[in-house]
Regions:
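Core catalytic lobe of class I
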Residues: 1-237, 242-244
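Class I S-adenosyl-L-methionine-dependent methyltransferase module
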Residues: 93, 252-253
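Conserved SAM-binding loop
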Residues: 247-248
Length: 253
């Protein structure tokens, strides 16, 4: 395990599913309001890091194992976000995970759909333009400790190009279908790099300035960039040495 201390966060080259890394993070941050995770999906992406010989049940159980460990690092009412996909025929670990992860002290509060602009798929099926984000709350209530959800503005009527007659607008709460974030196509820093805005939203909603947010699968380091923009601190954990080295280099001043 390698720990790099930056001015506004911590990067760890290690296995986030290990007790050693968990203990190290807890010693540094104490309990936190938000943990984010974008794990490998398992045989879904045609990349070496996504290959697994596990069945979907075994893969779901692997996810459950580190979820149960890391939920202990959350404050009461803390939020736990996990990215996932519908999978492929015969291999749907994320769907099994959603059912198995919930218990009386860990509630599945919502499943968010990120509606993307680019579609993919095969000719004999509907095209996919979505990705799922499970949102859990620690405790026996679905009410999170912090929920600072911003209102979104929606313009109605004509385009409003005439300054004499500005377009009317109204504000509305964000739904569990996010259509206002454009994805990154073939991210340059990681094959499945998330758009920064889609990472910022949970940080805005569940944390306050100065809070720590923990990312269990650091990847491109997008969570750190989002945290910096919003005045939060971060802990990023990445197992792959090459991905880790690139991530830390990008995050250095």
């Amino acid at each position: 395990m390698i720990i790099d201390v930056l001015s506004d966060g911590i990067c760890i080259n290690g296995d986030s599913t290990s007790q050693e890394v968990f203990n190290a993070v807890l010693d540094i941050t104490g309990v936190v309001p938000l943990i984010a995770s974008d794990p490998p999906y398992g045989n879904i992406v045609d990349e070496s890091w996504d290959k697994t010989k596990m069945s979907d049940v075994q893969f779901a159980e692997w996810m459950i194992k580190w979820t149960k460990t890391w939920k202990e690092a959350l404050i009461p009412g803390g939020a736990f976000y996990v990215w996932g996909g519908l999978g492929i025929p015969g291999f749907r670990p994320f769907l099994k995970y959603l059912i198995l992860a919930e218990d009386q002290e860990f509630q599945l509060a919502n499943v968010i759909t990120w509606s993307k602009k680019r579609a993919y798929g095969v000719k004999h099926n509907y095209l996919y333009t979505r990705e799922e984000l499970a949102y859990f709350v620690k405790g026996n209530s679905k009410k999170p400790a912090t929920f600072n959800i911003p209102l979104l503005e929606s313009k109605r009527g004509y385009s409003g190009y005439n300054p004499k007659y500005p377009a009317k607008s109204e504000f509305y709460r964000r739904t569990n279908v996010w259509m206002d974030v454009t994805e990154i196509f073939r991210g340059k820093d990681h094959p499945t790099q998330k758009a920064q805005r889609v990472v910022e939203i949970p940080i805005e909603v569940h944390t306050s300035p100065g809070d720590y947010v923990v990312d269990l699968f650091g990847g491109a380091g997008t969570t750190a960039h989002a945290a910096r923009k919003l005045g939060r601190k971060f802990v990023l954990i990445e197992k792959d040495p090459q991905i880790y080295a690139s991530m830390v280099e990008r995050l250095k001043p």
